[in-house]
Amino acid sequence: MTPESVHVYIVNRNRVSCTKRLVEWLLASGTERITIIDNDSTYPPLLEWYQSLNGGVAVHQTGENIGPWRAWDLASSMEVEPFVFTDSDVVPPPECPGDLIGKCLSVLADAPGCDKVGPGLRLDNIPTQNLTQEYFQGQSLHAWESQFWMRRRE
């Protein structure tokens, strides 16, 4: 299995700009198999963009909002090989290496018994002060994500 052949599943509902950026990043990184699991989106610009997709990007319409956990079950039921599962708003920053999937595969190979690996979210740009309603969950998000930064791997 090559990093390019790893199937990437993106769960999405009504998000167009970040989903576009993520798909563009994946394609630029050489990813060959991308499936967007759409949770019953209704946003016209997103639906129009879906219609324009081709070349290694498929959209699986669920017909209802099944949420992230059932979307995970759907993706894992279709795969026996390692795969990527991500939210549509997790867009790698410019400093993220293009061979991210390959690095994750290496970590999996070096860690018997490990069945999930992934990059950590940057924590230095998550507001922890509840300055606006938009960042109301900042504290709990920071606390949750901190657990994944116990040991850094390059």
Task: Give each language-model segment a name.
Residues 18, 63-72:
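A short, glycine-/small-residue-rich helix N-cap motif at loop->alpha-helix starts
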Residues 5-7:
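Cell-envelope/extracellular polymer assembly enzymes that use nucleotide-activated donors
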Residues 15-28:
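Short, well-formed alpha-helical segments that are part of the catalytic scaffolds
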